[in-house]
């Protein structure tokens, strides 16, 4: 298992193919749905709650796929993609901890949007504070997160929940 404290784009893509933490670990999406270019830091003892943190980044450029279709003449990154990135990172954290199975978003307590990601932005930064992880019959991670664009916080989410399941056929 790879317990590194940072990951580059190639390693994140490898996670999507089951080649970073192993073939049975939770996977990140690949291609357009992978909403980060790097994980700058990941640990299991930092953050606001002392139970772990993740900081990840997405480089923004006007050629990103979503700017062409959301919206015509008013391009903006869909807020749901930033939220999905937060869930992706909670699932990644569980795989980094050694969980096996398929990751699924289970919910979120509250989401607030107070700004937007436009094509002229340079960088999105995701900052997650792990609140709790459970590794029993139920494997689940819970985190609070913010999204910053060029250093300005524009999204926040509390109680992001991701579960890892050995069987999703009845989910």
Curated annotation (Swiss-Prot):
NCBIfam families named among the record's database cross-references: fabA, PRK05174.1
Gene that encodes the chain: fabA
Protein localization: Cytoplasm
Top-level division of the source organism's lineage: Bacteria
Organism the protein comes from: Shewanella baltica (strain OS155 / ATCC BAA-1091)
Assembly information from the UniProt record: Homodimer.
Keywords carried by this UniProt record: Cytoplasm, Fatty acid biosynthesis, Fatty acid metabolism, Isomerase, Lipid biosynthesis, Lipid metabolism, Lyase
Protein name: 3-hydroxydecanoyl-[acyl-carrier-protein] dehydratase
GO molecular function, one term: trans-2-decenoyl-acyl-carrier-protein isomerase activity
Protein family per UniProt: Belongs to the thioester dehydratase family. FabA subfamily.
Coiled-coil regions, chain positions: none
Function: Necessary for the introduction of cis unsaturation into fatty acids. Catalyzes the dehydration of (3R)-3-hydroxydecanoyl-ACP to E-(2)-decenoyl-ACP and then its isomerization to Z-(3)-decenoyl-ACP. Can catalyze the dehydratase reaction for beta-hydroxyacyl-ACPs with saturated chain lengths up to 16:0, being most active on intermediate chain length.
Reactions mediated catalytically: a (3R)-hydroxyacyl-[ACP] = a (2E)-enoyl-[ACP] + H2O; (3R)-hydroxydecanoyl-[ACP] = (2E)-decenoyl-[ACP] + H2O; (2E)-decenoyl-[ACP] = (3Z)-decenoyl-[ACP]
